[in-house]
Amino acid sequence: MELIERVNGHFLESMAAKQLAMEVLPGTIAQAAESMVACLMNEGKILACGNGGSAADAQHFAAEMVGRFEKERPGLAALSLATDTSALTAIGNDYDFERVFSKQVRALGQDGDLLLALSTSGNSLNVIEAIHAAHERQMGVIALTGRDGGQIADLMTADDILINVPVERTARIQEVHITIIHALCDAVDYMLLGGD
């Protein structure tokens, strides 16, 4: 019985985290989706980065954009900076791990593009460096963070968007992040394609 209760606890915590996010984040998520659509309609692209589970989320987001989410549509310009093992290992080896995303942002990012920066702690140094690089390239930033937003919260400019999940446990933050990513994909499709 103890194990069942432990398992149930995960579901209960996840529901509570999502309930809290639903109370405080929809307006910010909608604003982020509008920013993404504006970027894409102006022939910009969205670069996404993160570490570990956040790297998987960055890749998941890019796949939904380039492929499709739930509706058929042409591919949308998005790229995960966490998937090119040659670039990641070359930059990490020749420079340092803190620059694995920022070097790619400086090489690929342009004025009008967006950076989707994911960090559950808000303190991932390579994501912070990517945000600095995006600002240098005149790119907007949408940051998905957790807890108190960490150092990333302090880097946001008036043009950037911080979507912060105000819970402590990393697993719960990640679960809310993937829900936010799906909500962003759905909102982008809704604005571009209309429908129900």
Swiss-Prot record:
The keyword Repeat does not apply. Zn(2+) binds at residues 60, 64, 174, 182. It is found in: Cytoplasm. GO terms for biological process: carbohydrate metabolic process; D-glycero-D-manno-heptose 7-phosphate biosynthetic process. This is Phosphoheptose isomerase. Its main location: cytoplasm. Substrate binds at residues 51-53, 64, 93-94, 119-121, 124, 174. Its cofactor is Zn(2+). Keywords: Carbohydrate metabolism, Cytoplasm, Isomerase, Metal-binding, Zinc. GO terms for cellular component: cytoplasm. Pathway: Carbohydrate biosynthesis; D-glycero-D-manno-heptose 7-phosphate biosynthesis; D-glycero-alpha-D-manno-heptose 7-phosphate and D-glycero-beta-D-manno-heptose 7-phosphate from sedoheptulose 7-phosphate: step 1/1. Transmembrane segments: none annotated. One of its GO terms (molecular function) is zinc ion binding. Binds 1 zinc ion per subunit. Homotetramer. InterPro entries: GmhA/DiaA, Phosphoheptose_Isoase, SIS_dom, SIS_dom_sf, SIS_GmhA/DiaA_subfam. It comes from the Bacteria. Coiled coil: none annotated. It catalyses: 2 D-sedoheptulose 7-phosphate = D-glycero-alpha-D-manno-heptose 7-phosphate + D-glycero-beta-D-manno-heptose 7-phosphate. The reaction produces a racemic mixture of D-glycero-alpha-D-manno-heptose 7-phosphate and D-glycero-beta-D-manno-heptose 7-phosphate. Catalyzes the isomerization of sedoheptulose 7-phosphate in D-glycero-D-manno-heptose 7-phosphate. Belongs to the SIS family. GmhA subfamily. Its EC number is 5.3.1.28. It comes from Laribacter hongkongensis (strain HLHK9).
